[in-house]
Amino acid sequence: MEFTTEIKKATDPIYQKISKVLPEIEWPVHAPYIHKINKLKKEKNAVILAHNYQTPEIYHGVSDFSADSLALYIEASKTSAGIIVMAGVHFMAETAKLMNPHKKVLLPDMNAGCSLSSYITGKDVRLLKKK
């Protein structure tokens, strides 16, 4: 995607938030995507909820709300958007869907996992309950 004058002008306020962690030389690579994603969010009535560990481009560039998983669930339950994009891991998107069964919940990276949540299985929990 091309880094045009229009995109530079539209994304300049966003770059000011990212400038301390993203070198200026890299901004022309990211800005067109950030600009396009932000336009699509408005067109599609979508909201992007991002976990704290996301990259600066996502955290500052496209997310509407960034926080820990609990705060993301609370925000997901309050949003009026018809589409929730969860920039996080599987269980975060699953919980957002449970709280919003009538809304579309998207997980951009299907390989996004959490070592803590995959450490124990349902079978493990059932065995622990028997003890």
Regions found by a protein language model. Give the residues of each.
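Active-site loop-to-helix "anion-binding N-cap" substructures in soluble metabolic enzymes
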Residues: E2-K131
